[in-house]
Regions:
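SAM cofactor-binding core of SAM-dependent methyltransferases
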Residues: 42-103, 108-118
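Class I SAM-dependent methyltransferase Rossmann-like catalytic core
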Residues: 32-40
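A short acidic, Gly/Pro-enriched loop at the edge of an enzyme's catalytic core
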Residues: 123-130
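Short strand-turn motif at the edge of the Rossmann-like AdoMet-binding core
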Residues: 89, 136-137, 160-163
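C-terminal substrate-binding/active-site "lid" region of AdoMet-derived donor-dependent transferases
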Residues: 141-211
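Conserved small/polar residues in nucleotide/adenosyl-binding loops
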Residues: 212-218
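N-terminal auxiliary segments of SAM/dcSAM-dependent transferases
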Residues: 1-18
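Receiver (REC) domain switch-region micro-motif
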Residues: 60, 131-134
Length: 218
């Protein structure tokens, strides 16, 4: 085992258990999908649940459902009456993801939809107190602006994969479109006066964003 794997194992032994259902979902994701590591996993999943419990949102928007692991974790933290709206643009994931979401103990709190969140989320006609962004890295900035337009003042955005395996600092990836998208997003929000930002070196980079201002200054 690598040093990172040893530390991860230690952490998992000292936090809330993942639970049998999520364990089986994570395993199935790695067996039956091409990019299984994209699932949040035990450590980040427990953090997502805790953050929801701390923020106590009424509505959460998730951009990028993938296998449903993070959606279930987010929904686990929701208070009574809370709702998670989650969008997956890849319709080929639906046959895998929908049964796992519908079979979970929090299925009644999750509204799972296939479609482009940047187009479909504004059509819901509702606002959100929290959002988890984990979709197409090439359009992260566009997604951020869409989400911010639906976010209530004082709300929070969590953006995943913001360090992108370290590619954000590696010039070898200067021409990679996904790396470019992440860099563009990171550079923009670091200077956006509407928000406060922290980048956490958790897994592939997790960025909590606090929405503090209504509009850009003129």
């Amino acid at each position: 085992m690598t040093e990172t794997e040893v530390i991860d194992k230690y952490i998992c032994q000292h936090i809330e258990p993942e639970g049998d259902y999520l364990y089986r979902l994570y395993r199935a994701t790695n067996i039956h999908t091409i990019h299984g590591r994209m699932a949040s996993g035990h450590i980040q999943g427990r953090l997502l649940k805790m953050l929801v419990e701390m923020i106590r949102p009424n509505n959460i928007l998730e951009v990028g459902t993938f296998s449903g692991y993070s959606a279930i974790c987010l929904a686990e933290g929701l208070k009574e009456g809370g709702k998670l709206y989650t969008f997956e643009i890849n319709d080929e994931m639906e046959d895998f993801t929908r049964p796992w979401i519908e079979g979970s103990s929090v299925a009644d709190k999750i509204d799972f939809r296939i479609g482009d969140a940047n187009i479909e989320a504004p059509k819901l006609g509702i606002t959100f107190d929290m959002a988890f962004v984990d979709g197409d890295k090439r359009t992260y900035l566009e997604t951020y602006e869409m989400v911010l337009g639906l976010l209530n003042p004082g709300g929070y955005i969590l953006a995943d994969n913001t360090l992108w395996d370290g590619h954000v600092t590696d010039s070898c990836y200067d021409h990679d479109h996904q790396t470019q998208g992440i860099r563009k997003f990171n550079d923009f929000i670091a200077k956006d006066p509407r928000v406060e930002v922290v980048i956490l070196p958790l897994r592939d980079g997790l960025t909590p964003v606090s929405y503090t201002h209504l509009t850009l200054p003129t």
